[in-house]
A protein has these predicted regions:
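Conserved P-loop NTPase motor "coupling/switch" region that bridges the ATPase
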Residues: 10, 27-128, 199-203, 433-436, ...
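Inter-lobe connector of SF1/SF2 helicase motors
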Residues: 40, 94-290, 482-518
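SF2 helicase motor core recognition
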Residues: 49-51, 340, 381-382, 387-402, ...
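A short beta-strand element within the Helicase C-terminal
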Residues: 53-56, 397-409, 435-438
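C-terminal accessory region of SF2 helicases/translocases
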Residues: 126, 429-530
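Conserved helicase motor "Helicase C" RecA-like lobe of SF1/SF2 P-loop NTPases
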Residues: 334-356
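Conserved helicase ATPase core of P-loop NTP-dependent helicases/translocases
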Residues: 360-389
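Conserved SF2 helicase motif VI
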Residues: 414-431
Length: 530
């Protein structure tokens, strides 16, 4: 792009929420491109985790210390104050107050910042004020059915092992192998220490997500964790500790795709610096060996777990549910290994109908996805009816030949659910209704209420045992177990609506005046803007 940006005055950034993190090299490059330009950001989810999400986007076209937003020249101070309000509270101990402050912050941002900068359009408003235009163009929005929860029921033995494992990986495991510098006795860089602490937290979340994703993916991850611990301890006993600052910046990309195999390789291969094992506290080896024994314990616990209640429930649902039997289906999972596992098992029951696409797929596979699942594809095919995919297809690709999304993992952040369903929830779809199914772990029960209650308890166990680290699981969104379950089983989580009307109704009034009373419209045009 060097030199190309100089030829343009206007920059339009689609899926702008992908640039909420200003510490990345991509953001830095985009910031250079936008400098001195007119910038338009297009996104369905501008605010996801914290108020600073918005600030990062604003910096692409506003000077943070000298903005032109009315009565708000210093954006850094404004957003810093909002962040400070949250940092004073412990989300776990002061949950209600934390939620109140979160809502208050969102209102402040909306009233003092976004109303001056954002043009917001919801489908409800467009149907209300531009229904005639839609009709004339032969367009319509599909109805969004209430998401259907699918409960996979753990038997007594499975439930015991599942619950015990959550406790072990969330509370007992130290993740010492991923943060060696926290045990170092020599001089160190504080930023490196913090980076490794974050690494430990993210590896914890990765294991938790794997456990909920599929028993298969979890077992594979435990094997890899155990292998990397064995190698690390062997090197430590030889007097060597290898670590590097380099991998910490890249690892988040792999974690985003839940590719822990790539994370392990990155950490193991990037042995840029060697430290003498003598310069680490005795607690380091103790914790390393403790974690290794814990991994062996977990592996033994799961050795006899051959039944997969989640997969069994899914295959039965695919075979008996009329909506799933007759429509194109998109199955989302955050784990590449779960995607492969699902593909192999679903293909046994529906041979030749299943296509898999993840981060390791080739460009030709992407073309297959488009030809079979994009309703507007110029080279439409009907070779596949079921698509198993990861987050790589949650944005940027239209899949609206399908009207069904199945979330095989819990979408811990409801924003992700909206993005996934957005692939099929298009204005030009030929389907009348959009369907969503979400999986939840539960225990054997004889009623929907009992299953729902048990599922909420499972979610609560994840969030409670993770404590402050739960914010990494939900990607910063503060939710409790009941609220999360309710949001994931409501249509609002899919269409993203539920807030107050925007200014569209007033613009519609002005438009009507322009069309029907030109004299009054000329008078309005002469009115001062403020």
């Amino acid at each position: 792009l060097d030199g190309v940006a100089d030829k343009f005055d206007n920059i339009i950034i689609d899926e702008a929420h992908g640039f909420r993190n200003e510490t990345t090299a991509t953001y830095e490059k985009l910031s250079e491109i936008c400098r001195g330009k007119r910038v338009i950001l297009v996104t369905a989810t501008p605010y996801n985790n914290t108020p600073k999400d918005i600030l990062s986007l604003l910096k692409l076209f506003q000077k943070p210390r000298k903005s032109d937003i009315p009565n708000l020249p210093d954006l850094e101070s404004f957003f810093g104050g909002l962040e400070k309000n949250l940092r004073k509270l412990d989300r776990k101990k002061n949950y209600e107050e934390y939620m109140d402050v979160t809502k208050s912050n969102a209102k402040e941002v909306r009233e003092k910042v976004l109303k001056h900068l954002m043009v917001r359009r919801t489908r409800t408003e467009i149907k209300k004020y531009f229904g005639e235009d839609l009709k004339n163009q032969g367009l319509s929005f599909p109805d969004v059915a209430k998401p259907i929860p699918l409960f996979y029921q753990l038997n007594e033995k499975e439930d015991k092992i599942f619950t015990e494992t959550i406790g072990l990986i969330a509370s007992e495991f130290t993740y010492a192998r991923y943060m060696p510098m926290t045990y170092y006795t020599g001089e160190f860089d504080q930023s490196e220490i913090q980076g490794q602490k974050n690494m430990g937290r993210f590896m914890k979340i990765l294991l938790v997500k794997r456990l909920e994703s599929s028993f298969h993916a979890f077992k594979q991850s435990v094997d890899r964790f155990l292998n990397t611990y064995e190698i690390f301890i062997k090197e430590f006993n030889n007097g060597n500790v290898y670590t590097s600052k380099k991998h910490t910046s890249k690892v988040f990309q792999f974690l985003e795709n839940d590719d822990d195999g790539a994370v392990q390789r990155l950490i193991d291969d990037d042995k840029a610096e060697r430290y003498d094992g003598k310069n680490f506290t005795k607690e380091f080896l103790r914790d390393l060996e403790h974690d290794r024994e814990l991994l062996i314990t977990i592996k033994e616990l799961w050795k006899g777990m051959d039944r997969d209640p989640k997969l069994l429930t899914f295959i039965e649902q695919l075979s008996t549910d009329e909506t799933l039997k007759k429509n194109h289906i998109i199955i989302f999972t955050e784990s590449k290994e779960t995607a492969g596992y699902l593909f192999e098992n679903i293909d046994k029951h529906f041979p030749g109908e299943v296509l898999r696409f993840d981060g390791s797929s080739h460009a030709s596979d992407r073309d297959k996805v488009i030809r079979n699942f994009d309703a507007k594809s110029k080279n439409k095919e009907s070779n596949y009816r079921i698509l198993v995919t990861t987050e790589v297809l949650s944005e940027g690709v239209n899949l609206h030949r399908s009207n069904v999304v199945i979330n095989y993992d819990i979408p811990w952040n409801p924003t992700r659910l909206m993005q996934r369903v957005g692939r099929i929830n298009r204005v030009d779809t030929k389907h009348k209704t959009i369907h969503t199914y979400n999986f939840f772990p539960s225990v054997q029960g004889d009623s929907h209420i009992a299953l729902k209650s048990a599922a909420e308890m499972k979610i609560a166990a994840f969030l409670s045992l993770l404590g402050d680290d739960a914010e990494l699981l939900t990607e910063g969104e503060p939710v409790d177990s009941h609220a999360l379950f309710e949001r994931l089983t409501s249509s609002e989580a899919i269409d993203g609506e539920g807030e107050e009307d925007s200014e569209l109704r007033y613009l519609k009034v002005i438009e009507d005046i322009r069309e029907n009373d030109s004299d009054l419209f000329e008078i309005i045009k002469q009115l001062p803007r403020k």
